[in-house]
């Protein structure tokens, strides 16, 4: 019976891995891009009822509960060595600080400005990976498109820019650490496939639990109003699912099969996706400037050549 159960579990994991591998990584990135803006829009509306740091804590804590129920990441934690645990602790602290600073910035600056500043860190990562003239041109087109789309204006509360640039640095660290766990498999359990696409998600779940612990001292007090108001609490849980579960999971599935520089460059699609969502959901018709920006970003991403597969990139020196 035990053998049959193990074989059944192995078969399910193999089938799941096969399904994920058959889907193109860009499809996972597309899902992440949509929710990257849907989540913050819900959060900003909740600021009128719950403190900013309280909303950040609700986002992180609700995501941690979802990952805990879904993936039971404490089982993974028991199998990790000290160096692997350090990476997950680092990612957890980054997630807690990044989400908090992001909302503090959004409370003081337009979302488009915060998003444009956030993209600067990924530009640096994409630049490090632009080892050919073709990729350098692709990067220039994407950056130019983002500049046209966002029309960044340095106006607003100075403290907001401090938070925004802090979030920029932390978002860059999220991409680095997130890509690391996506492409560095943990020793599999018995009869598990060697390349289980859920390995990175399990590690992400452990980091999210750590993030919830790290954010609790600074955010739980501000979240108390939501804990006594069912509608606001449900709203906060929705923010967590839309902002820290769906996009982070799909990020992991995309990162596992894309080089880090390629993933960083594809993040240039986020402002373009925001324009598309504005047209479809809000009826905001884009002008010529928006269409030009989208065209530049799409051309840049299409021109980029991966060169090195994500898993091979991990084995390359340096």
Q: In which residue ranges do the predicted regions lie?
A:
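Hydrophobic transmembrane alpha-helices of multi-pass small-molecule transport proteins
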Residues: 6, 120, 124-127, 133-153, ...
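Glycine-/small-residue-enriched transmembrane alpha-helix faces in small-molecule transporters
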Residues: 1-57, 90-93, 97-101, 140, ...
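Specific alpha-helical transmembrane segments that line the substrate/conduction pathway
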Residues: 54-64, 95, 102-131, 167, ...
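C-terminal-most transmembrane helix of multi-pass membrane proteins
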Residues: 2-12, 60, 268-318
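Transmembrane alpha-helices of multi-pass small-molecule transport proteins
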Residues: 2-5, 9, 25, 49-97, ...
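Hydrophobic alpha-helical transmembrane segments of multi-pass membrane transport proteins
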Residues: 31-38, 42, 70, 89-104, ...
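Membrane-interface helix-cap regions at the ends of transmembrane helices
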Residues: 15, 42, 49, 63-81, ...
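Helix-helix packing/entry segments at the starts of transmembrane helices
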Residues: 58, 114-120, 178-185, 190-212, ...
